[in-house]
């Protein structure tokens, strides 16, 4: 129609020919679109059918075995990192309620999943009445729920998955509950492939082997992180730890000055309780004497990248990649 309206001054014959051409093209495009829609619908239906075909299934877990007759459509999660796992593999629609949802609200990467109208915030501890109100198909719990397992099981089939500092240990077990192990495996593969590729860039630019500290303001000093959750950055990318680094610890400003790392990654204080602030640090002679501060190797980060969560650590690699481009 647009093509025809722009050719009003042309001869009637040419106009008719153009209209016929447009009609034929539109028909062809419609056929292609319809074909693509049918194909996409077929793929989606096949994926859903594949997941559904894997039920009934028996899930072995920390408290024995749980039989699931059909794929769960409404899940309550009593340990918020397991909600992260479901979000990571694109299964947010099954997350009905989350104990500790407020913790995810502290981190920007989860903004799309924690807004009003999404999963219900069930508070900081598992509350039987709140869980009953949601009428879940399945409850996914963690080690701490062993003491209330019988109560939870009366509400819905319950699967207990022991927590881990390494999300790759648990994401597959969470995905197994809904028959989507393949999605979890793909997410892990994508992450590890990205980590390996980025590690190569670190080596090429000479960053590998440089000392780094990942920390967050806490009280009058800092918390730093160096355990399993940080292995992608140290063992994977090749940052070096300072001597005596623990899995987790508190460190003073003077302590940071003593180790004087090449790189500092400072997480934002999501608690709002730290007495030490970045503005105060900028006035400190000790802070300004640090190698990382003087050489522009201080980076302010969202704290989720130092956590044990799948989406947070995927974001961590994206942050590192962005930083690499600035070096």
What are these regions (language model features)?
Residues 151-216, 306, 310-327:
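Extracytoplasmic substrate-binding proteins
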Residues 104, 221-249:
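Alpha-helical, coiled-coil/dimerization segments enriched in small aliphatic residues
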Residues 135-140, 157, 256, 260-264:
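Proline-aspartate-enriched helix->loop->beta-strand connector
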Residues 2-3, 9-13, 18, 27-84, ...:
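Bacterial Sec-exported substrate-binding components of ABC uptake systems
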Residues 61-63, 120-129, 246-253:
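Short helix-initiation/N-cap motifs at beta->coil->alpha
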Residues 263-327:
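Structured C-terminal subdomain patch of bacterial secreted/periplasmic proteins
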Residues 82-130:
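A short, structured surface patch at a secondary-structure boundary
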């Amino acid at each position: 129609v647009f093509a025809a309206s722009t050719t009003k001054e042309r001869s009637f014959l040419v106009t008719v020919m153009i209209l016929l051409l447009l009609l034929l093209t539109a028909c062809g495009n419609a056929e292609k679109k319809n074909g693509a829609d049918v194909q996409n619908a077929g793929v989606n239906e096949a994926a859903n059918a594949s997941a559904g075909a894997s039920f009934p299934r028996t899930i072995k877990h920390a408290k024995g075995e749980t039989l699931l007759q059909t794929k769960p459509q409404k899940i309550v999660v009593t340990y918020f990192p397991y909600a992260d796992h479901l979000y990571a593999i694109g299964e947010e629609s099954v997350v009905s309620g989350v104990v500790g949802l407020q913790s995810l609200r502290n981190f920007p990467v989860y903004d799309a999943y924690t807004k009003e109208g999404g999963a219900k915030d069930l508070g900081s501890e598992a509350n039987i009445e709140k869980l009953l109100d949601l009428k879940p198909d399945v409850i996914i719990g963690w080690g701490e729920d062993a003491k209330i397992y019988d109560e939870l099981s009366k509400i819905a089939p319950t699967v207990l998955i022991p927590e881990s500092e390494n999300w790759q240990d648990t994401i597959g077990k969470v995905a197994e509950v809904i028959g989507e192990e393949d999605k979890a495996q793909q997410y892990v593969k994508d992450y590890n492939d990205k980590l390996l590729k980025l590690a190569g860039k670190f080596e090429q630019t000479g960053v590998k082997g440089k000392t780094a500290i990942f920390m967050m303001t806490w009280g009058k000093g800092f918390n730093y992180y160096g355990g399993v959750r940080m292995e992608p950055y140290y063992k994977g990318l090749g940052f070096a730890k300072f001597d005596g680094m623990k899995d987790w610890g508190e460190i003073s400003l003077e302590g940071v000055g003593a180790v004087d790392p090449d790189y500092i990654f400072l997480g934002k204080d999501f608690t709002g309780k730290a007495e030490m602030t970045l503005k105060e640090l900028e006035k400190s002679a000790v802070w300004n004497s640090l190698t990382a501060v003087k050489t522009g190797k201080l980076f302010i980060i969202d704290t989720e990248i130092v956590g044990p969560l799948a989406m947070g650590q995927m974001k961590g690699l994206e942050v590192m990649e962005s930083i690499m481009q600035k070096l």
